[in-house]
Design a protein with these regions (language model features):
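Short, charged, surface-exposed hinge/linker loops at domain edges
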Residues: 1-5, 43-110, 116-131
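A short, exposed loop/beta-hairpin motif centered on an aromatic-Gly-Thr core
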Residues: 25-34
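N-terminal segment of the canonical double-stranded RNA-binding domain
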Residues: 1-15, 20, 73
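Short, proline-centered helix/strand-breaking motifs
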Residues: 22-25, 100
Length: 131
């Protein structure tokens, strides 16, 4: 999966930093420090984008086309959908599958964990490393 880069506006406050993502209307957060604000904005971007098909993600505005005011500054921030999903959408889901009875019997005799085997096979097939 690829990463999606968006310009993000950071605005220092008396206490902490406010953060806005102009290309994702209503996507904003804050943090007590710049580091915390960066972590929080990636989570906020994920919440905004999680129910949208990546092919329909809003197009990113060029950073030099974003208007800034006062102490605001802009940074390009990457949204990594795979990293977001691994962190926030790791809940197991049930899958129903069919295999020949003889294969099922052999696997059960050898105490094969079907869920574990399927996960490993899918990770391998998709070229994704386990983390």
């Amino acid at each position: 999966m690829k990463k999606y880069f968006y310009p993000v506006i950071f605005e220092p406050e008396e206490v902490g930093v406010s953060v806005y993502v102009p290309d994702l209307p209503g996507c904003f957060t804050q943090g007590d420090s710049l580091e915390e604000a960066l972590d929080n904005v990636q989570e906020a971007m994920g919440l905004f984008l999680e129910d949208i098909d990546p092919k329909d993600y809003p197009k990113a505005t060029k950073p030099n086309e974003v208007d800034l005011e006062g102490q605001q500054f802009i940074m390009m921030v990457a949204f990594d959908k795979l990293a977001y999903d691994r962190k926030y959408n790791a809940k197991a889901v049930k899958k129903t599958l069919s295999i020949p009875a003889w294969l099922n019997n052999m696997a059960q005799e050898r105490n094969i964990n079907f869920s574990n085997l399927l996960q490993k096979a899918l990770l391998n097939e998709l070229g994704v490393t386990q983390q």
